[in-house]
Amino acid sequence: MASFPELSERAQQLLKALVERYIGEGQPVGSRVLARDAGLSPATIRNVMADLEELGLITSPHTSAGRLPTVSGYRLFVDSLLTVKPLHQAIVDQLWLDLESRENPRDLLETASKLLSELTHMACIISMPRRETLVFQHIEFLPLSDNRVLAILVTSDQEIHNKIIHTPHKFSAAELQTAANFFNAVCGGKDMVSAREHLRAELAKERDRLSEQLLQAGEIAEQALAEGGRSRKPFLVRGETNLMDFVELADVDRLRGLFEAFRQKESIVGLLDRCLESPGVKIIIGEESGFRPLEPCSLVTASYSVDNRVMGVLGVIGPTRMKYERVIPLVDVTAKLVGAALNQRTLAPT
């Protein structure tokens, strides 16, 4: 963030008033309006606004004599001038009731994204739990007909991954149970990537003393681990159509670019990964995203964690003139509640 040590208290207060009025009304703010609100002369206001414009904190659109904040102006406002109040406890309690009642992690995240988009009237984006952070819990095998085995893999988010695997010969239920016991002992408590690598190394090391059936079952387990560690759709987006309600985003070409951005997984995933790098709420404003379709937008995110391990990130996408004082606590609290609800499931007895 740029530093503005030379900014007087009066200039800061006028910038704050200008940003708040622009966020509320969506129209460039004139000096007469600010003068009336601040009880100062229009000439004094114009002088201060000239200084703010010279510093790149506000700008004047061609069609108006009023001013509106730049990305730098929003950044100074969000980082230094904004007062964020806690959410009403009734909202927090209702969010928890809605999230805690979900039966599985996917439903929980779906519900969180829906609630957040409804509460903010903007688009909500949630990255799914990162597969490499998930922990292997256990694996089971069931013999099927025609030399097929059903591998059932359970991970720490309580997701169940099923894969039918064709085998070179028919396994008995007892052989498969022995194999499952061995693999659970070898892989238990390890993340998905480490579990697969450790299993492969253990099978290679013990190859001479393990039965051919167990070695073949090891190949089945490796396939199941690979399937369980493979990413599904990396994120959820809900409430995209809410963005059509904002005048500055309602241009057809701009909306097309935004909706296309939601389909370009690589760019969005890269942006969400950036948001995972620091704890707490992270705010990306306009061109700070480095992603052209999102330049007219701000992204407010917070990571959610399970057992002190960051699993993903959730956030709100809306116009740069969003009501940050409301969006920030909603995102922050929702992320904490999602983590708490997921943690409750992870720690629950199976």
Curated annotation (Swiss-Prot):
Signal peptide: none annotated. Keywords: Repressor, Stress response, Transcription, Transcription regulation. One of its GO terms (biological process) is negative regulation of DNA-templated transcription. Pfam families: HrcA, HrcA_DNA-bdg. One of its GO terms (molecular function) is DNA binding. Negative regulator of class I heat shock genes (grpE-dnaK-dnaJ and groELS operons). Prevents heat-shock induction of these operons. Belongs to the HrcA family. This is Heat-inducible transcription repressor HrcA. It comes from Methylococcus capsulatus (strain ATCC 33009 / NCIMB 11132 / Bath).
